[in-house]
Amino acid sequence: MATVAVALSGGVDSSTTALLMKEAGHRVFTLTMATNDRVAAEAARVSAFLGLPHHVLDISGLFEQRVIGPFCAAYLEGRTPNPCIACNRDLKYGTLFRQAVEWGADYFATGHYARVRFEPEPGRYVLLRARDPRKDQSYVLFYLDQERLARLLLPLGDLTKETVREKARAAGIPFTAAESQEICFVAGDDYRTFIRRRCGQAVAEGPFVDRQGNVLGRHRGIPFYTIGQRRGLGLALGRPVFVLGFNRERNAVIVGPEEELWHTAFLAVDVHYILPQPAGGTLIEAQIRYRAKAAPARLYPQPPDAARVVFEKPQRAITPGQAAVFYQGERVVGGGIISCAVR
């Protein structure tokens, strides 16, 4: 019997994870990263129902420093971040994981839909996609290292969402019914309103321009646009145009025809490998957005922590700031943050 710490939010996934760990006969305690009283109360209610010791870590300061601050800064710089990447790397599998181990946990369990297994060849733990491709969350976990993977339990990785809900309901768990929103700290996932309230003074109107620098109109501020956007531009040009990029020096949003959104390659930075670093030209599948389909590509590592990825076919709207995760079959090779697209 092992001691297992469960990261508990009070939602159906983490609540069912706690249930499964208890049913497996482990000594279980729960940990909650609290950014507000509501989250702490919901998690405490579930933990009490299951009869498990519960601990709350107030990470509001760290959350501001490691997640919200960089999120805002990225948008101000014309990048489109995925805050879940930083939250999982630095907080859930950083601060929370370390606290769990310090308090005696042999293993750390979460409600993520992914799988972990040890493979004798290459002699390490590997991260795999979930059995249910509709719920797979391996994309946001590519920064996990061997220390964490060796202690990680992901009991939902072999289950469907429907099965998880059925288990929770059958047990009578008082879980939070609502599905998690895409950005947990942004009401209604309306990031534009959030940015305007948080850093409106740093947002300035500027010109829409084409590739030649011709002014086509005025925009409301670089953070309110993302690569590939067509709607909401307010341009009446007699032809459809899309956001292609940004010119920070001119505070300009570059727009143009859709065909200019397609690129065959990109550069990634802050690259981390779970499998051994591949040789240059290794065939992989690269996933450039959370719900995008991974596409065949060649991976060219550029030590110490960058990589160039070349697709077999051009991809639409490769977006700086988004994570790019590299797969071979169902195994996660590694991943990084898109720096720029390359034709």
UniProtKB/Swiss-Prot annotation:
Annotated site residue numbers, Interaction with tRNA: 112, 322
In this UniProt entry, which cysteines form S-S bonds?
Answer: 87-184
Per the UniProt record, which EC number(s) apply here? 2.8.1.13
Query: Mainly resides where?
Result: cytoplasm
- Protein's GO biological process: tRNA wobble position uridine thiolation
Query: Per the record's keyword annotation, is Disulfide bond included, yes or no?
Result: yes
Instruction: Summarize where ATP binds, as residue positions.
Output: 7-14, 33, 111
Q: What are the GO cellular component annotations? A: cytoplasm
Catalysed transformations (reactions): S-sulfanyl-L-cysteinyl-[protein] + uridine(34) in tRNA + AH2 + ATP = 2-thiouridine(34) in tRNA + L-cysteinyl-[protein] + A + AMP + diphosphate + H(+)
Q: Which GO terms describe its molecular function?
A: ATP binding; tRNA binding; tRNA-uridine 2-sulfurtransferase activity
Keyword Cytoplasm listed? The answer is yes
Role of this protein: Catalyzes the 2-thiolation of uridine at the wobble position (U34) of tRNA, leading to the formation of s(2)U34.
| Name this polypeptide is given | tRNA-specific 2-thiouridylase MnmA
Q: Which organism is it from?
A: Desulforudis audaxviator (strain MP104C)
Question: What gene codes for this chain?
Answer: mnmA
